[in-house]
């Protein structure tokens, strides 16, 4: 879960959490909890984020570089 939080933070970059949350249609509080490792991501939200960044799910969860 920590690898996902670190990768997500790096991908979000300078974009505000609220703006990113709006773009991927995931509540801001949920994104914040992912970044703080307080909530495990659902498969549907993982797919939304992977699609948005055009990244492989394995990369997002830290299974490959």
Question: For each predicted feature, which ranges?
Answer:
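A short, Lys/Arg-rich alpha-helix, primarily the initiator
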Residues: 1-19, 23
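Short, charged recognition helix plus adjacent turn
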Residues: 3, 14, 51, 61-65
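Conserved hydrophobic/aromatic packing and binding residues within compact polymer-binding modules
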Residues: 8, 20-21, 31-34, 60
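Short, flexible active-site loop motifs that bind/organize anionic cofactors or intermediates
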Residues: 10, 21, 36-39, 50
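Short, Lys/Arg-enriched C-terminal cap helix and immediately downstream tail that follows
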Residues: 11, 43-44
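Short coil turns linking two alpha-helices in DNA-binding domains
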Residues: 16, 27-30, 42, 56
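Recognition helix of helix-turn-helix/homeodomain-like DNA-binding domains
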Residues: 25-40, 63
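DNA major-groove recognition helix of helix-turn-helix/homeodomain DNA-binding modules
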Residues: 44-59
